[in-house]
């Protein structure tokens, strides 16, 4: 926990963290000891004579009262004193209302008289309970309570023969008797509660008849509890040390400190006391009264009254909402706020003040859009920026800048508000008279204003998912609103109609680093929720992109130039125009191709793509240009729209993110917007009323369609009137009618809509918005132009509101379209008043629905989060919760993160056996085919070698097994799966990078493929470990991916389809491995919260009310939010429980048999088949009253099989409905049998034949024989009979089951429409075939009985009632069912949520072995700590419970730590740093006293390395411009390689251009004399020949300032996708230009040094270094082992097999293939812009800085002797030998990125005080630098750049000369004697001191880029015989064999000056000396 307390007293070291919180009940003694008011508080008054009264309620000992006062106890003032407790001694004990229930429970468990436990603690059951409930005291009490419930006698000693329910073995018998329980053997009373009083009542009155019911006084209870022993306390679930039972009764009342109940002072009036003080006053008053009464011996009833009142007051102080009690009021009648109300609820203490607080350093204002900002920027108003501060610590590197800010003070922006001295003093600059007098020292803190480039968190409520809070970089802009890029509105769900957003400025560098690395917008582009981007191109840009990429868009030269101006990554080359004559024209697609980054490949379709185009002979040609193909970063064809640029999975943005990384994708967004929007300015887009008018023919069509629809409706109405309408099965007549009408009207709307759309021209602006996907849909168009359509309320047509009509304007019972809400006008035509009213009704419903839904889903989301908040991926990769229970063994069952997977198809699943064999089996018999696909020698090998053939057969076998496995996993044949590494796209990339010609045979040996894949799948490890379980787990986790891998990379497809070369295949395998490893979920990831958000967010989009979808006999199912609620609440009674019954065998196919089963299941009562019933008085059956029955009745009575005499004269006649009978397959006989079975002989039931015209049952009561005896009472009996018959009638109709299962009220039978319910079988040929089988769906569930029915498929039959599945099938089944149900709810409205989130929720709910509801009944019954529970719901109850049981909270979860202000164990907080204390000793002091160390520029303000105010649009716009030199611009190489570590930025032709930037760095583009490669003001690196490939230009170089908006200037010419090769004939490129020195290798893009691996240097380029014969990429002799391979790449290993510079053999993302360092991967720790030594915010990174410490990633212990303080370590020191083992060029610490190896400053020594990387004087491109300025050398006034003698390239010039100083007369380049071997040279010469002021690396003399290397320098001539790189004897400084030894300080094998590309070194030479 970082320092608490006020900021001034910040403790530097972290305070101790709280490990555990113990709860308990305070004992009276402890309360008294804790209290500061001796003798208790006796007076209800607060003051006496205006002074606080001692012993009163505002006792001065309890805390500070006045602002100015001090506390009498601790002498602290208002802010320091925390307040102190007092106490009141109560005259009589009272119950504590919070513990009342607990008190009763304990009372019921112990003997009323002797306080012994009612069950002996030796009872085995008790032992069992104790064992089971370890650590769960509450459970223990519950179990013991259940045991004691039945006991009503306290078991005594002797009677105790064996009262246990447990039989004891003989031996124990006497032992028990002897010891006994020692109870008193008396009867126990029942304990009852009424209000706040307890009563004891005895059921069994003992011999000495006691009174039945007594009032239990708290004293009595206190006595009983006191006598309970500690052991028994423990058995009762108490913790005797922290919570004894008698403490639950209040004897001493604590008085809360004053700070808890402050008084409010009103102006001029008396103090208003807090509610608690009022309450305490009441208690004190009544307590004093009670004590007085007791002393005076008042009557018992008076005292009882007083006690009752005291009890009431104490209770209402704790809880003022007690049921059955009056509220305690203030005089005004407002109920008092009790302690409980203070804590609970959203506004309460816990949720309102502890879990969520208001914070400082936040800002809020309205948002407005700004397309010119990058997506990760936010425009902040200057007024806000000047008010919010960031505390920056003063270091030697920022002291000048901060001093300047302090000088400006708070009044001007940018300035500072406070200085905090190192002793903690705060100086407020607002009130300081002369801020300029204040001097800073290192270690002070300056609270400076927010400025450009600061990192902030931006947030919009409601914060539904993590993309609602993202990190942005600040850009200060004028005016008062936040500005943000349009693309970011999607994740924030923001619009600009007045939304406000919040901004938080983080206050520590750690926080900033975390936000920058984890939460910046570009890193959030892809969401793990549904593995797709959440940001796309929106609105005008989207509309424009569609227009821009159409086939007919051509741009003139001027327009193209203008657009390229806005492309920040442009490299200065305009592509070849598509059309040359009559004048050059460029297409829109061409320009868009320049925006697309890197080598992206992508195939999508346009929104208007017709489906039938995908097959057939012309599938590759798209007539409407609707198929989008992006290949190698070029848009080949297709119109872009929302599908390719929106937020869908697989869009261009998504691929860019996955392939090129987040940084490049950020630029992609920005570039699309700037370029396209600027084109739209020229092109224009508007919409007017004219766009909504169609032609007259269309209107005619619309009229006709509506007329016909109305006609149809009238016909349907007539049919219904005439009873000709057949109800569809399962629907009533009315429903059927409504459905038909609805269908007719909806069809009419759709038809008119489509005709309206067809009539619109291609140029219609409505249409262009809809087609591009920017706004609106087809329905909107049709509503505007054609028909608004049917208005619905609750899913039905407008209901009748008045009597039988909707509005008084219509006639009654009008079912026509108009009267029931069909709007036949369009919006354009306008609505009639009635239409308008109906439309308003429909609209209003939508609004209400939304409002209600928001509250519902908000609560659901909160519950989800609370239930899973602490579920995280731990370091062993399991997913566990805060109490370390395993929830999942691997996250998502595959251990991968949601962001990095994508949809892929499993190739082997679908095809038939034949197709499968043809595609996957390597056919080595077909020689002709082999020769077409493989090279000759391979063909021979394959044909001749049986071993190879066996291997290939085995491979095919393996794939066949895979296919079988897949067909078990995906029985439906759905081959779309979510996997990492899109293999097909990676293969495509490989083909492009390696220029694979798919028509040439491949040199890839099939066996190499098989082996390679085998090896690879061994490397893809999700579960480490070698035991059988781990191996099994590993197989499960990677099964699908391995199958996918084997089927995609099988030898046959490699040879035939992909034709990869061997080298390409190796690249591919490495790439897959690295991508797979990057996809693994990070330990520390809070996947619980992630899952909760991912489910809660789509829930917000769901519909609330389930509209019953009008369909044919479909049953209604609950969907949407109500269903989600049912599922996570695990409701016992779902609204629509239902079974889906699948059938077996014949029944499934035969409708009749299926019908049989339907009848067997559907519950049928007599009522369902009855037409009518009647009761007749029919005394004489022979002549029955009902004439039509006479005939068949006679048949019965002729030969009666019953006693006719006993028959009752009353007759119940039931007429059955024949249709229903046949429908239900019932016979009369069955019914009669059922009746007889039910009533036996008491009823007589006769029935007619099944074929009779009417089916009739006649039922009579049979009177019992006794009735016959009592003739005289007959009349009464007759009366009774008919009443009795009535009862029987109703009973029979409703309760008598004829057939079926009671719970199943209705069964529907249908053929499935969707595939997932069809039966999928696999035919003989191995194809999937979906069969339609009858399935039954039921209303009501009874799974157990249905599964046991005959012909029901027990495997597939399923229920949607979760609880039922749990009871029938158990926990595993219910987990799967829950997952399926959730998936169904979410996917119903087309959302998709990645499986891992659903799975995690299901696992959370079921991992305990029972169903845990996501409600307080589930979540709060877990074993998590009380603090977590109380932050969810039932706050006070949870805390009381915890106190009573003495629980403790282990502080392992998230909520607990947040409450206590500690760092939660989440994300970066879940592990500790391991610091090697020994290594810290070798740190290095920075000399802080040397003047000039702080970099003061011309104005004294230096913004170079600090967040600079340079503009994002153009540096020229800002007043402070020194930092904004072009060198610092976006095209400084840093961005180039920043986009992809060391690879070509966007240049398609330079597939593996190691420089990372195209050769666009020509001096022509350098507006200042410096070279464009010259370092930025804060960069200590000088570009040098190897610079192109040197990792020093990685984004981690301080020159790359990710926070400098200047970093993205639109003129930045760094990438040119179309530059095929930079033609040296370009006019701006003249070799005579003084800046252009062909001999300065780092200085000419045509010089080979620009990336030897770059294929873009075509050998045809004339200036392609003809002097270096070995240097031609096509020359076979150029191999990586050739010594001329740049030694500047220190860790490059020439043995890397696949490295051949002629082939772009490495990919930016694959660590194994970066030529600059095999170990260099974007995930490697050194590749991180925030890595501590590289943090762009820490300008101090230089070897002189204390930060340059062994923990820096550059420094590794492999060079133990390197200590920055060691004076001998300096390249100039004689004992520095490159041959020394510690300095192997591969040593990671020896990397060109380290400033100490700036080879161009050979003598640079770390101890040189003057060397500061950000010294602005060191920028050749700095505006103030002019080569002609004679005085420009900060250290030597005599130095003149015009002197020819300063050319470091002069062969004679040796920087190692000790005398070398610009003033030394001895030095003359023409003096032939001058050579390092000259005797004057001795490193010990005193003059040679690296600190010598004349010898400062900052001196411009040392820039090889200095324009003075002029080719005219006579000594440096390429024609000089010495100067031939091929001359074997050539040595850079002197003839071979001279003492130029490796110990010479100037020589460094890694010095880029000696790189192969430097024409000044001989290949052999560099090799020998290496």
From Swiss-Prot:
Region ranges (Trigger loop): 1083-1124
Modified residues (Asymmetric dimethylarginine): 1810
N6-methyllysine modified-residue sites: 1838, 1859, 1866, 1873, 1887, 1922, 1936
UniProt-annotated stretches for the region Bridging helix: 832-873
Gene Ontology annotations for the cellular component aspect, listed alphabetically: euchromatin; mitochondrion; RNA polymerase II, core complex
Protein family according to the UniProt entry: Belongs to the RNA polymerase beta' chain family.
InterPro entries: DNA-dir_RpoC_beta_prime (IPR045867), RNA_pol_asu (IPR000722), RNA_pol_II_repeat_euk (IPR000684), RNA_pol_N (IPR006592), RNA_pol_Rpb1_1 (IPR007080), RNA_pol_Rpb1_3 (IPR007066), RNA_pol_Rpb1_3_sf (IPR042102), RNA_pol_Rpb1_4 (IPR007083)
Residues annotated for RNA binding in this entry: 67, 460, 499
Domain notes per entry: The C-terminal domain (CTD) serves as a platform for assembly of factors that regulate transcription initiation, elongation, termination and mRNA processing.
Keywords for this protein: Acetylation, Chromosome, Cytoplasm, DNA-binding, DNA-directed RNA polymerase, Host-virus interaction, Hydrolase, Isopeptide bond, Magnesium, Metal-binding, Methylation, Nucleotidyltransferase, Nucleus, Phosphoprotein, Repeat, RNA-directed RNA polymerase, Transcription, Transferase, Ubl conjugation, Zinc
UniProt binding sites for Mg(2+) 1: 493, 495, 497, 499
List of residues that carry Phosphoserine: 27, 217, 1843, 1845, 1847, 1849-1850, 1857, 1861, 1864, 1868, 1875, 1878, 1882, 1896, 1899, 1906, 1913, 1917, 1920, 1927, 1931, 1934
Cofactor(s) in the UniProt record: Mg(2+)
Residues bound to Zn(2+) 2: 111, 114, 154, 184
Identification of the protein by name: DNA-directed RNA polymerase II subunit RPB1
Cross-link (Glycyl lysine isopeptide (Lys-Gly) (interchain with G-Cter in ubiquitin)): 1268
């Amino acid at each position: 926990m970082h320092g608490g307390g006020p900021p001034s007293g910040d403790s530097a070291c972290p305070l101790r963290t709280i490990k555990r919180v113990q709860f308990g009940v305070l004992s009276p003694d402890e309360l008294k000891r804790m209290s500061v008011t001796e003798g208790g508080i006796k007076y209800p008054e607060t003051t006496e004579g205006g002074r606080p009264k001692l012993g009163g309620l505002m006792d001065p000992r309890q805390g500070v009262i006045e602002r100015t006062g001090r506390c009498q106890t601790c002498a602290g003032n208002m802010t320091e004193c925390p307040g102190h407790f007092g106490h009141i001694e109560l005259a009589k004990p009272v119950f504590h209302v919070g513990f009342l229930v607990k008190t009763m429970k304990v009372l019921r468990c112990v003997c009323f008289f002797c306080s012994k436990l009612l069950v002996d603690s030796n009872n085995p059951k008790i032992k069992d309970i104790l064992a089971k409930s370890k650590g769960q005291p509450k459970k223990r009490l519950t179990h013991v309570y259940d045991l004691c419930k039945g006991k009503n006698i306290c078991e005594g000693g002797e009677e105790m023969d064996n009262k246990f329910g447990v039989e004891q073995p003989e031996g124990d018998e006497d032992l028990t008797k002897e010891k006994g329980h020692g109870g008193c053997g008396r009867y126990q009373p029942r304990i009852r509660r009424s209000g706040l009083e307890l009563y004891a009542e005895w059921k069994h009155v003992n011999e000495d008849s006691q009174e039945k019911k007594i009032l239990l006084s708290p004293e009595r209870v206190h006595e009983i509890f006191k006598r309970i022993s500690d052991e028994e306390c423990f058995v009762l679930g108490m913790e005797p040390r922290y919570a004894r039972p008698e403490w639950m009764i209040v004897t001493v009342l604590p008085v809360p400190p004053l700070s808890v109940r402050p008084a409010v002072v009103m102006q001029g009036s008396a103090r208003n006391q807090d509610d608690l003080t009022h309450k305490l006053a009441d208690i004190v008053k009544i307590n004093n009264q009670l004590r007085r009464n007791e002393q005076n011996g008042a009557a018992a009833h008076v005292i009882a009254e007083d006690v009752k009142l005291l009890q009431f007051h104490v209770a209402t102080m704790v809880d003022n909402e007690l049921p059955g009690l009056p509220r305690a009021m203030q005089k005004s009648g407002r109920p008092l706020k009790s302690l409980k109300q203070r804590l609970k609820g959203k506004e309460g203490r816990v949720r309102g003040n502890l879990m969520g607080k208001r914070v400082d350093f936040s800002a809020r204002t309205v948002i407005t859009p700004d397309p010119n900002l990058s997506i990760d920027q936010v425009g902040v108003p200057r007024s806000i920026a000047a008010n919010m501060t960031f505390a920056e610590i003063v270091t030697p590197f920022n002291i000048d800048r901060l001093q300047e800010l302090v000088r400006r003070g708070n009044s001007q922006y940018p300035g500072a508000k406070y200085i905090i001295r190192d002793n903690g003093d705060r100086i407020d600059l607002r009130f300081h008279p002369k801020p300029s007098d204040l001097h800073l020292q290192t270690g002070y803190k300056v609270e400076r204003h927010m400025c450009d480039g600061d990192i902030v968190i931006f947030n919009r409520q409601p914060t539904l998912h993590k993309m609602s809070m993202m990190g942005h970089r600040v850009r200060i802009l004028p005016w008062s609103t936040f500005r943000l890029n349009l693309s970011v509105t999607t994740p924030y769900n923001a619009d600009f109609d007045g939304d406000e957003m919040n901004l938080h400025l983080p206050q520590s560098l750690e926080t900033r680093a975390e936000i920058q690395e984890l939460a910046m917008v570009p890193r959030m582009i892809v969401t793990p929720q549904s593995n797709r981007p959440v940001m796309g191109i929106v609105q005008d840009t989207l509309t424009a992109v569609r227009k821009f990429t159409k086939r007919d868009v051509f741009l003139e030269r001027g327009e193209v130039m203008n657009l390229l101006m806005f492309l920040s990554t442009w490299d200065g080359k305009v592509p070849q125009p598509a059309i040359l004559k009559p004048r050059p024209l460029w297409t829109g697609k061409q320009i868009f191709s320049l925006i697309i980054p890197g080598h992206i490949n992508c195939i999508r379709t346009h929104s208007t793509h017709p489906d039938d185009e995908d097959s057939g002979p012309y599938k590759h040609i798209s007539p409407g240009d609707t198929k989008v193909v992006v290949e190698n970063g070029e848009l080949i064809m297709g119109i872009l729209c929302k599908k390719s640029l929106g937020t869908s999975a697989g869009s261009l943005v998504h691929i860019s993110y996955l392939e090129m990384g987040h940084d490049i994708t950020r630029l992609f967004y920005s570039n699309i917007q700037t370029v396209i929007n600027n084109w739209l300015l020229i092109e224009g887009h508007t919409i007017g009323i004219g766009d909504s008018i169609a032609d007259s023919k269309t209107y005619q069509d619309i009229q006709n369609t509506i007329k016909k629809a109305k006609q149809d409706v009238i016909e349907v109405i007539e049919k219904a009137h005439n009873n000709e309408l057949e109800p569809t099965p399962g629907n009533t007549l009315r429903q059927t009618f409504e459905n038909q009408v609805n269908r007719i009207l909806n069809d009419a709307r759709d038809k008119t809509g489509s005709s309206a759309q067809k009539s619109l021209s291609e140029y219609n602006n409505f249409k262009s918005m809809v087609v591009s996907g920017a706004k609106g849909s087809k329905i909107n168009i049709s509503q505007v132009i054609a028909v608004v359509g049917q208005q619905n309320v609750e899913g039905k047509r407008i209901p009748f509101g008045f009597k039988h009509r909707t509005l008084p304007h219509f006639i009654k019972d009008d079912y026509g379209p108009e009267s029931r809400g069909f709007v036949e006008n369009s919006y354009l035509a306008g609505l009639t008043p009635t239409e308008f009213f109906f439309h308003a009704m429909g609209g209003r419903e939508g609004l209400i629905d939304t409002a209600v839904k928001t509250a519902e889903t908000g609560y659901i989301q909160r519950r989800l989060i609370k239930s899973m908040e602490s579920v995280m991926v731990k370091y062993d990769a399991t997913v566990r919760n805060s109490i370390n229970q395993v929830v999942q063994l691997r996250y998502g069952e595959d251990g991968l993160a949601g962001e990095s997977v994508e949809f892929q198809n499993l190739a082997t699943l679908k095809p038939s056996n034949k197709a499968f064999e043809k595609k996957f089996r390597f056919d080595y018999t077909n020689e002709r085919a082999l020769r077409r696909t493989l090279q000759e020698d391979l063909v021979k090998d394959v044909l001749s070698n049986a071993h190879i053939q066996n291997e290939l057969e085995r491979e095919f076998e393996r794939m066949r097994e895979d296919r079988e496995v897949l067909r078990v996993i995906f029985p439906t044949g759905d081959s779309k799966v979510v996997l990492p590494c899109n293999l097909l796209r990676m293969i495509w990339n490989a083909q492009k990078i390696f220029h694979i010609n798919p028509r040439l045979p491949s040199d890839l040996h099939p066996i190499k493929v098989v082996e390679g894949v085998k090896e690879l799948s061994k490397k893809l490890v999700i579960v480490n470990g070698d035991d059988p379980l781990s191996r099994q787990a590993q197989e499960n986790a990677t099964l699908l991916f391995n199958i996918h891998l084997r089927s995609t990379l099988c030898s046959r497809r490699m040879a035939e389809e992909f034709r990869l070369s061997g080298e390409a295949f190796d690249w591919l395998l490495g790439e897959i491995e690295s991508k797979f490893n990057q996809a693994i979920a990070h330990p520390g990831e809070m996947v619980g919260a992630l899952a909760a958000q991912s489910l809660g967010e789509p829930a917000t989009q769901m519909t609330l009310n389930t509209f019953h979808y009008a369909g044919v006999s479909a049953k209604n199912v609950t969907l949407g939010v109500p269903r989600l609620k049912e599922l996570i609440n695990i409701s016992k009674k779902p609204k629509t429980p239902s079974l889906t019954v699948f059938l077996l065998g014949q029944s499934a196919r035969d409708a009749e048999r299926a019908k049989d089963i339907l009848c067997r299941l559907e519950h049928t009562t007599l009522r369902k088949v009855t037409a009518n019933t009647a009761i007749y008085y029919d005394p004489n059956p022979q002549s029955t009253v009902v004439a039509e029955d006479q005939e068949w009745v006679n048949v019965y009575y002729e030969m009666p099989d019953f006693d006719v005499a006993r028959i009752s004269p009353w007759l119940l006649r039931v007429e059955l409905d024949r249709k229903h009978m046949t429908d239900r397959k019932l016979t009369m006989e069955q019914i009669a049998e059922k009746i007889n079975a039910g009533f036996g002989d008491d009823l007589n039931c006769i029935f007619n034949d099944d074929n009779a015209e009417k089916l009739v049952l006649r039922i009579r009561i049979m009177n019992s024989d006794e009735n016959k005896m009592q003739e005289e009472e007959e009349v009464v009996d007759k009366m009774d009979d008919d009443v009795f018959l009535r009862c029987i009638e109703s009973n029979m109709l409703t309760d008598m089951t004829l057939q079926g299962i009671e719970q199943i009220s209705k069964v529907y039978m249908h053929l499935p429409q969707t595939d997932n319910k069809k039966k999928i079988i696999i035919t003989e040929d191995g194809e999937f075939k979906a069969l339609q089988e009858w399935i039954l769906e039921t209303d009501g569930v009874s799974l157990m009985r249905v599964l046991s029915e005959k012909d029901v498929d027990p495997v597939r039959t399923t229920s949607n009632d979760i609880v039922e599945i749990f009871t029938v099938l158990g926990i595993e089944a219910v987990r799967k069912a829950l997952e399926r149900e959730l998936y169904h709810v979410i996917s119903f409205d087309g959302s998709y949520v990645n499986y891992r989130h659903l799975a995690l929720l299901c696992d959370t709910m079921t991992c305990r072995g029972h169903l845990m509801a996501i409600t307080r009944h589930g979540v709060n019954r877990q074993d998590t700590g009380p603090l977590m529970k109380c932050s969810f719901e039932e706050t006070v109850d949870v805390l009381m419970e915890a106190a009573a049981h003495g629980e403790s909270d282990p502080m392992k979860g998230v909520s607990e730590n947040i409450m206590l202000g500690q760092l939660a164990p989440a994300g970066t907080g879940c592990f500790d740093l391991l610091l090697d204390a020994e290594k810290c000793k070798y740190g290095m002091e920075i000399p802080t006293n040397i003047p000039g160390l702080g970099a003061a520029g011309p104005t004294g303000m230096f913004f170079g390395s600090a967040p600079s105010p340079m503009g994002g649009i153009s540096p020229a716009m800002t007043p402070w411009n020194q930092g904004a030199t072009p060198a610092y611009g976006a095209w400084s190489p840093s961005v180039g390689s920043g986009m992809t570590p060391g690879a070509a930025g966007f240049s398609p032709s330079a597939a593996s251009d190691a420089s990372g930037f195209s050769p666009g760095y020509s001096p022509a583009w350098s507006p200042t004399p410096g070279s464009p490669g010259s370092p930025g003001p804060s960069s200590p690196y000088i570009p040098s020949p190897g610079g192109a490939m040197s990792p020093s230009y990685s984004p981690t170089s301080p020159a790359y300032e990710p926070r400098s908006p200047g970093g993205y200037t639109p003129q930045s010419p760094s990438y040119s996708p179309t530059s095929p090769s930079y033609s040296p004939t370009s006019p701006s490129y003249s070799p005579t230009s003084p800046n252009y020195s062909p001999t300065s290798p780092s200085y000419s893009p045509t010089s080979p040094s620009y990336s030897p691996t770059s294929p873009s240097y075509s050998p045809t380029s004339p200036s392609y270094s003809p002097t270096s014969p070995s240097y031609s990429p096509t020359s076979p002799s150029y191999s990586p082992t050739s010594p001329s391979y740049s030694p500047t790449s220190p860790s490059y290993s020439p043995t890397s097999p696949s490295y051949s510079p002629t082939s772009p053999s490495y990919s930016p993302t694959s660590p194994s293939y970066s030529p600059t360092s095999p170990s260099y991967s974007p995930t490697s720790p050194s590749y991180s812009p925030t890595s501590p030594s590289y943090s762009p915010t820490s300008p101090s990174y230089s070897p002189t800085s204390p930060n340059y410490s062994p923990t820096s990633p550059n420094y590794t212990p492999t060079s133990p002797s390197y200590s920055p303080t060691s004076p001998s370590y300096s390249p100039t020191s004689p004992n520095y030998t490159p041959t020394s083992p510690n300095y192997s060029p591969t040593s990671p610490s020896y990397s060109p990125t380290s400033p100490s190896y700036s080879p161009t400053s050979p003598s640079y020594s770390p101890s040189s005080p003057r060397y500061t990387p950000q010294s602005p004087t060191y920028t050749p491109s700095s505006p103030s630098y002019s080569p002609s300025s004679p005085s420009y050398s900060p250290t030597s006034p005599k130095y003149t750049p015009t002197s020819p003698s300063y050319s470091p390239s002069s062969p004679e010039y040796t920087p190692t000369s000790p005398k070398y100083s610009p003033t030394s007369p001895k030095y003359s380049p023409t003096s032939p004697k001058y050579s390092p071997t000259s005797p004057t040279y001795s490193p010990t010469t005193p003059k040679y001191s690296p600190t010598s002021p004349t010898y400062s690396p900052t001196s411009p003399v040392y820039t090889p880029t200095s324009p003075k290397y002029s080719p005219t320098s006579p000594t440096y001539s390429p024609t000089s015989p010495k100067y031939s790189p091929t001359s074997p004897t050539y040595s850079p400084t002197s003839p071979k064999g001279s003492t130029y030894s490796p110990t010479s300080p100037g020589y460094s094998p890694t010095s880029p000056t000696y790189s192969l590309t430097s024409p000044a070194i001989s290949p052999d030479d560099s090799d020998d000396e290496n």
